[in-house]
Amino acid sequence: MEKPAGFWIRFLAYFIDGIIVSVPSYIILFIINSVFVAGAVATNPYMTEEEYLVKYMTLAFLPTMLIMIVISVLYYGLLTASKMQGTLGKKILGLKVVNEQGERVSVGQGIGRYFAYILSGIIFYIGFIMIAFGEKKGLHDIICKTRVVYK
């Protein structure tokens, strides 16, 4: 059985992944918001603040959030299920994600693991803090029947 990865190395991988996902996400956010502001002012320079906010929420903010979620799901979910067996942050640090049998996870497990990540962080990050103890599994690992180990 491979050695399980502890809290701090996994935290560093998560931090690296956050940077990798944030850069393209914020570039997209900047482009969409810039186009929206220019378009909104050009179409009606006299709109009220309420009209502007409604347009912004429907035409810029919500689509941007949807794009950012899709980027995250694809990055975390598909890379975890790929031959790399983990994200770029995990690869850089020599880690991989495996199922309970020590094999590569399925696409469903990879995507499910991303959404379980969110659940792990909802209540004061307790689902992540669990990694520091016992079997070194976070809530997302337990839910998706995965573990992170050294290559």
Curated annotation (Swiss-Prot):
Location of the protein in the cell: Cell membrane
InterPro entries for the chain: Pra-immunoreactive, RDD
Keywords: Cell membrane, Membrane, Transmembrane, Transmembrane helix
UniProt main location, coarse: membrane
GO cellular component annotations of the record: plasma membrane
Membrane topology summary: Multi-pass membrane protein
Membrane-spanning intervals of the chain: 12-32, 59-79, 114-134
This protein's name: Uncharacterized protein YxaI
Organism whose genome encodes this protein: Bacillus subtilis (strain 168)
